[in-house]
Structure formats: C-alpha cells, structure tokens
C-alpha cells in the first residue's frame, strides 16, 4: 500500500497538555481525540493508548512522551502529553517537544498545586508563547462560587509568572464525562478547542525567518572552492547571496556560489534541507564544524549567557558526584562542543545553593572560551568527556 501523503492544507501547530499530576491531562487528551473523531478530525484514542508512552531519547536523555495528532476546522495539531513530572521537565528543557502553546490542565477540585506552578514557570522560562486553561473535573464541583475562586487563583498565578492572566481563556471541562460520551461535556471540549484555535497564535514558519545553517562538515572541491555542508535550520539561501560565517573566530563575509542537494544543483536551499554550500574566496581552514552560516547582519556571536538546566541523574548516565561553581564542562551547541565554565548558579526558584547534585534543576550563568552563535531559547547539552551530563536552554544573553 502506498504511504499516505501528509496533506498540508491547514496550518500546523504544536501543542501539549501541562499541569499537576492526576489533574487529568491524559484523560483530557483522550477526550479531545474522541470528540474530534466524531467529526472525522482525529483517530479516537483511549487513556491506555496515551498513557503507555514509549521512551524516546533526545540529546542523550530518555523521556517518555505520547504524541497524538488531530484537526480542528482551521488547523492541524500535533499534541504531546507526558506521563510523569520529570518527563515534562526534561521535555521542555531539551525542546524534544517544541510547543507553540500549551493547554494548562487544572482540577477544579484541587485548584493550582505545586506542579501547576512549576509547569507555568517552565513554560515561561523555555519560551512557550501562549496558554489556554482547561479547568478539569468541573462535574465534581456543585458550587459555582468554588469554580469562580479557583479561576481567580489561576489568573493571579498566571499574572505572577508574566502571562496575561486576565486574557487567557479558562474553559470548564470534564475530560472523563466527555470521554464517556456525555454530550454536554463533549460540547465543552469543542469549546476548549475553539479557544485553543483562537488564542494560540500560529507560529512563524521556519522558512520565513532569517537564514541560518550550522556547519557540520567542510571539504574542498578542486577547481571550485570550499563547500560547507549542514541542515538549514531556518530561512532560505539563494545562489549569489552574501552570507556571514559566525562563531569561534571573527565573523567573515562570503558569497554562496552554489547550492547542492543529493548531488543536484539548486537555485536555493530552504529550512529543513540538507545541503552543501559552495563559498567564494574561503579556504578549507577558514571554516569549521560549529560555525554557522547566516543571513548578513542577523546574528552576533556571544560568550556569556544564562540558562535553565536539568542535570542528569546517575541512572540516566549522568555524573555520580555533585559539581560546584567554576565547573568547566563542554557545552554542545548545535554541532560542536565548546569549552566553558559554569560561573554561578541558583536553585530553580532563585534560592542560593552551594553545589549541584545529579537530578537537580538549576539556573546557571555560563561563560564560553570563544564566541559562538547562541540565541535566547536555544537548546544545548552539557557534556563531559563526550557523554551528556545535562541539558539546558538559553534563557538570556549577557554578552
């Protein structure tokens, strides 16, 4: 049977369910697929299908994640749901599941709990741009005043993490009742998806952003010049265009004289393509793995940054012992290891800590020995002798 072609007739958006353990994230995810399946926009999945999420490896870290897909009238969604709290932390920090927005699930019976707060904070730190709240288990609360109080509490909480608490839609749902086929609650799930359609903005397509390609390999072709290969991360590049070579050494300007993919010559390469770019006037020794080719003037290299980091446990292949300020690991950024130093760190909530234990989540300040094209929101791994001991996301550029 021929493989089904992915139809691109609707804009694609990546979302996920976040929130406290047992507040009903997975049940709600199942309910969404069941309600939309009745309109032919999804394949119905039950709790067990989603809860038995397979393990995945992302940057050397094992994460359990369930992926479901569905459509609404206007969009195609890829939706991630994680079984355990630690999986969320790892998922959001490694960017294994990039989210354009999230559904924050909060049980009306409990109100916001510890992980509700932690997930909102994480969403803020890793740059999830928009949230919609699903106030779940509303079938179990008879008193509308209680629901009103919980809603106020959620809005204040969102405000305290710099999300627009007053504007974020809160939809009262019951994932369980909707899953059981109760039409009133099925209607609420539809209402939730309408809110998601309306308030989670469509992401800017990678191809519309300024060109960037991380260099993976370099070789010279006799009589033609130097070729840099890699996957175009964003934007597009045309033959004859000027690009900058950024990172590790001083920034240089060159012209792309050829774009090649699968041994064929192209007029342009675009986001997602694995290409070889022929560069004018550049010697093989002028460019190396770890540098990036970018649209002229779009990016500057940096050496100092702040990051949110998850440090692997011993069982995950991480360190067995703690580390202290001044620790010098390698930072694996895009395609290369750069030596650097963790000059300072605090616990995730900003309180001071003396040392970092395997399994901790920290905020850290890092300093690299040479300038590299790092950007806010970018993911990196922390390595020691070639093995990953932590994963992070750049939360702020200092210098």
Swiss-Prot record:
Residues 174-176 are annotated as: G5. Residues 60-64 are annotated as: G2. Residues 136-139 are annotated as: G4. GO terms for cellular component: cytosol. The keyword Zinc does not apply. Its EC number is 3.6.5.3. Residues 81-84 are annotated as: G3. GO terms for molecular function: GTP binding; GTPase activity; translation elongation factor activity. It catalyses: GTP + H2O = GDP + phosphate + H(+). Pfam families: GTP_EFTU (PF00009), GTP_EFTU_D2 (PF03144), GTP_EFTU_D3 (PF03143). It comes from the Bacteria. SUPFAM superfamilies: EF-Tu/eEF-1alpha/eIF2-gamma C-terminal domain, P-loop containing nucleoside triphosphate hydrolases, Translation proteins. Residues 19-26 are annotated as: G1. GTP binds at residues 19-26, 81-85, 136-139. Belongs to the TRAFAC class translation factor GTPase superfamily. Classic translation factor GTPase family. EF-Tu/EF-1A subfamily. GTP hydrolase that promotes the GTP-dependent binding of aminoacyl-tRNA to the A-site of ribosomes during protein biosynthesis. This is Elongation factor Tu. It comes from Prochlorococcus marinus (strain SARG / CCMP1375 / SS120).
